[in-house]
Amino acid sequence: MDSYFKAAVSDLDKLLDDFEQNPDEQDYLQDVQNAYDSNHCSVSSELASSQRTSLLPKDQECVNSCASSETSYGTNESSLNEKTLKGLTSIQNEKNVTGLDLLSSVDGGTSDEIQPLYMGRCSKPICDLISDMGNLVHATNSEEDIKKLLPDDFKSNADSLIGLDLSSVSDTPCVSSTDHDSDTVREQQNDISSELQNREIGGIKELGIKVDTTLSDSYNYSGTENLKDKKIFNQLESIVDFNMSSALTRQSSKMFHAKDKLQHKSQPCGLLKDVGLVKEEVDVAVITAAECLKEEGKTSALTCSLPKNEDLCLNDSNSRDENFKLPDFSFQEDKTVIKQSAQEDSKSLDLKDNDVIQDSSSALHVSSKDVPSSLSCLPASGSMCGSLIESKARGDFLPQHEHKDNIQDAVTIHEEIQNSVVLGGEPFKENDLLKQEKCKSILLQSLIEGMEDRKIDPDQTVIRAESLDGGDTSSTVVESQEGLSGTHVPESSDCCEGFINTFSSNDMDGQDLDYFNIDEGAKSGPLISDAELDAFLTEQYLQTTNIKSFEENVNDSKSQMNQIDMKGLDDGNINNIYFNAEAGAIGESHGINIICEIVDKQNTIENGLSLGEKSTIPVQQGLPTSKSEITNQLSVSDINSQSVGGARPKQLFSLPSRTRSSKDLNKPDVPDTIESEPSTADTVVPITCAIDSTADPQVSFNSNYIDIESNSEGGSSFVTANEDSVPENTCKEGLVLGQKQPTWVPDSEAPNCMNCQVKFTFTKRRHHCRACGKVFCGVCCNRKCKLQYLEKEARVCVVCYETISKAQAFERMMSPTGSNLKSNHSDECTTVQPPQENQTSSIPSPATLPVSALKQPGVEGLCSKEQKRVWFADGILPNGEVADTTKLSSGSKRCSEDFSPLSPDVPMTVNTVDHSHSTTVEKPNNETGDITRNEIIQSPISQVPSVEKLSMNTGNEGLPTSGSFTLDDDVFAETEEPSSPTGVLVNSNLPIASISDYRLLCDINKYVCNKISLLPNDEDSLPPLLVASGEKGSVPVVEEHPSHEQIILLLEGESFHPVTFVLNANLLVNVKFIFYSSDKYWYFSTNGLHGLGQAEIIILLLCLPNEDTIPKDIFRLFITIYKDALKGKYIENLDNITFTESFLSSKDHGGFLFITPTFQKLDDLSLPSNPFLCGILIQKLEIPWAKVFPMRLMLRLGAEYKAYPAPLTSIRGRKPLFGEIGHTIMNLLVDLRNYQYTLHNIDQLLIHMEMGKSCIKIPRKKYSDVMKVLNSSNEHVISIGASFSTEADSHLVCIQNDGIYETQANSATGHPRKVTGASFVVFNGALKTSSGFLAKSSIVEDGLMVQITPETMNGLRLALREQKDFKITCGKVDAVDLREYVDICWVDAEEKGNKGVISSVDGISLQGFPSEKIKLEADFETDEKIVKCTEVFYFLKDQDLSILSTSYQFAKEIAMACSAALCPHLKTLKSNGMNKIGLRVSIDTDMVEFQAGSEGQLLPQHYLNDLDSALIPVIHGGTSNSSLPLEIELVFFIIEHLF
């Protein structure tokens, strides 16, 4: 035992030395994680693609890193396992030094089939130093020795091993890998491990390769379990048992980082879904997780699951000191791990299986101690598993009895956990768990039914933090954990996570959990007893007492940030929580974990400060509700340097569950490396973040990168490296990129794009980035940027472009105060602050904590609500002040349909108010494994649990303000961000006038996909629902898949409030029930068409009796209008849209006629901004009239429904008002068959008929239109269509009865008929002088017919050409007293257009000013945002309208120059509520000026400066070509680029 332990310590010391000497190479978290993944993934890399696919469902592929690694490592595992197994004594006969303790005993699992896949992942070794050491020793000494240690039957006893391995491995893999890298670096001498690493992790540095063979084996083993390869499992199991404990200990300690946990949370779902995805992406773990999340997209399960785990969370303020609370067992919701439903054949473990249960129980035991570490390990696979676990999971992992020696050692997990898993041999019963659910100890309720059915039901998985009772968590983590052998503990912790996860919601519902039974064989196997190990480590354990306080301090600071999540947790617990992922893990795992923790990158035993890169305080966003989830990730990696032989004393952590208050400190203390340099720590973080951001904004909880490097015995110190790392690294990378010529990657070494992995072909050519030298496809390398070494613009990839842009923006932001912060950033990122003893303040001093680019962990956590501000990317606040650089944050967008994470290829930087929601996402390059960039992602708006809950989301409640808006009362299907008490939109401080305010679209793109249509394809599903009160500071929330029943309940609620649907990121539709003219109508109104230059649309559709579903065809109509507007095809007054297929469940519905409301009643309608049109449903037989003579149809509708001039309502199933075309004068004037020609209509030309005279008023400005009519008509007939006259009190209406067209008059209600309008006039020059008439005038249908002689026709033509008035006298030649007169008058018609339109510059009315639409030849786009100039208004000053033709070209030039000047600022303008901008240009002989504003307020000066430099040259160049004076106003909209 002694020699064993010493050897382990010695190895650990060496590893630590290596880490300290080569921190860069070892990027702790990433490298380790990558290595771990690589070991387990590399082996599976080849198998992964095939096996993963076959073994796991698509969703599971997400489970990926675990699953894929599991699959692929199947082959490698078998070999590795054989070797390692040989080194390991049979579980039955011996206890490994690393002792599987609980984990080992768990290995009693009957088979990998029995054990759930998730469990497999979770079972990965946690980094048990001792275990690892043992493995190393065996590996290094000889395979034969190992073989000797293991009985023959050990191999056959794969089940037991499997159980252990699965639980420990799965958990450890992702997180552990990070820790393992450092810890097991040396241990991993086995060729197999190196192979695995090499395969899987190209990007991972040597650290990954160094991962203990045992770790890789155990990791692989987990994979094998998933693979269903019993043989492999058996072999691995033995190996794992031995290795796992040690590996697990280390891994668990490191992996326990919040980051890892976060990853697991978000990953679980994603992982389950895409096991395959992980295979290549150890480095890209984040991406994988994100992808998984995407696939799971809709499954909020991860997040939801996490909350339950929170319930389960170990936070037990009471047990804090004495008991190890399962670190964030809430995290373990991920562990809920799937007990992959028993259904899953090979992968799902039989929950009932004693062996499996044993594993889980052991895992639980271990986790109780090792929870932090094991959790950290779990994050990659275990947590993922937990997230993945579907509440559906039929198979529940029933912890088997693990009452064996190991169990005794196991520390009792919180009572809650105990309820579910009773260490000390008591069976876990689900009923107990249910009871304890209240205590927060409830594990994720849902287990994944089957590995194949990896999708987690978001609703099912959702666990509410509220349900957690802080007090209940008091259940003590069994102190006996110390008793558990360190190795066993780590393994157990992993297993525990998995097993805890195994408790499915179903189990919670009351199914009894099987006892976690530890295999006797497994117990007998260990070389060193738990008691011996505990005794040996006791002194060291005592040394970690300071760690607790340190962690508490950290937790306090973090807790402020996460108080929202903490809602259900006790404040005391929060304080008690240890954030040391490593130290925490270590404490739980005892000596082993400590050792692992020691491995932490900067762990300096000498100082007694183990600078655990992992000491990061992970704020697990998995579930905002999962308070315990906040894994006490701050690792108390500061295990006393006093530890003997370099081993860190194990320390019990009473980890009160608490909301993850800080970002995942996934990143190592090492400053972020330049994009070309792989940063394992960074990679790990990205994995967690990606998953988090993808599946849950909450996951993207990492608001602060706080590395609490170590909390040494003497005191605790915070390492701030990670916090600034994002902005700082970005800045550094941006500064470095382009300074010198990069190394050119040869074409031969890049068969695929190094960003999107697309294969290069003859047509898809290679492009080298001039900034980084890598090879990309044309899509990924389509940017241009000025590089210093070239002194000119050159082609760069999208990643370098973003990095350089961010660096430039960051520098611009640096003010006198900002620059100081900047310098502090770098210092804090790389240095460990001196330990501060007895630091009890819950708010760490600024010097102690890293200055987060996202937020300051201390004060802002408390005052997040008051501190929320909006600022521009370049650091300017809306009021012109300089923004504090420490608050720089960004927003993330998520797809409403696929919940996909940000594309690794498309960096998004968005200013957001909510620091606590940001997550750091790094993009590892699939080919090189290098992290090409760091990204801070924040999603201020997410979905809210339920409409009823909406109001509460804005309060200081533990529930995230933004989570998926589940109309369901109780469920927060997906809480994306456990954010500050009030998740505020970026533009929250901008007053939103109403649901029709165009500014409401400013942030929609952050919550939905950039798809042109978000309408589901099926008939029943509805588009995403946006719920917003329209009040200042209100928090919009999005429900991805609302149901008709829920919508009806909302619509029929009090006051008939409208609901808003998101048809795409640029178009909203408000729906409401209204009573109009005593009937009930569906009222639809759009918001967003103005951005394309299209008038908004309203539709009033009569409700059918007992109609309880929204007519979705209306949404399709709006999408059609939107697409037409994109093409420049606009709908205006009296235009139409027709259908060729059934519409609104009837083939008789022909389309819509659109009119501009005039005399109609609009008082009770929530109208959109002007201009807008009203759509009226028409029948198929009415289509000809809508096309050739729409005014006739409009007026006929008015006569039918007693409305003047027309109704605004649409009635389904009505009889058509016109039948087959009969004998009508229109047959002579228009083509009613093929629509080849129609009646020439002159806008604003009016025909007024009174007694004895008729007047045809022709606007002078329409002279050109009149000339067109004359030139196109024959010499005998002139026909002109008129406009509807608002000056007339009645109008002629044509009615068809039995094929005969008759004339009626329809008048406005309550007005006497004096002036009657007509729809057209026909001058017929065929009247013969011999007829005895001078001229004849008569009413024909709804128009005026004037018959004149040829001579009179010639005079009329001449008068029209010369723009002179003309009078026609009608009547008989001899009847002087009975004559009538027809006057043709040229009038200066008053401009009545643009009614209700106001200027964005200063708010003045634009009514009466002529305008015309502008169509630019090209769009100006940046960051997927387009600036569109839609219209120009002319402020004429006694000028002839003829100048408009020349002014239009000048206006286009101004529009292009302005668009180019605004382009760099589109994102900041839009995010700050300025998505509609007006530009007014005034030019005179001695004066040139312009004004730019939005919503009546001038733009900030720095925007005007850019406009000045762009516009002045254009204005001066255009003055000579335009008539002066000239004053115009251009309207610009900033919209999203949709696909």
From Swiss-Prot:
User: Biased composition, Basic and acidic residues: where in the chain?
Assistant: 661-670
Q: List cellular component terms (GO).
A: cytosol; early endosome; early endosome membrane; intracellular membrane-bounded organelle
Membrane topology value: Peripheral membrane protein
Q: Which domain of life is it from?
A: Eukaryota
Binding-site positions, Zn(2+) 1: 753, 756, 777, 780
Keyword check for NAD: no
What is the protein named?
Zinc finger FYVE domain-containing protein 16
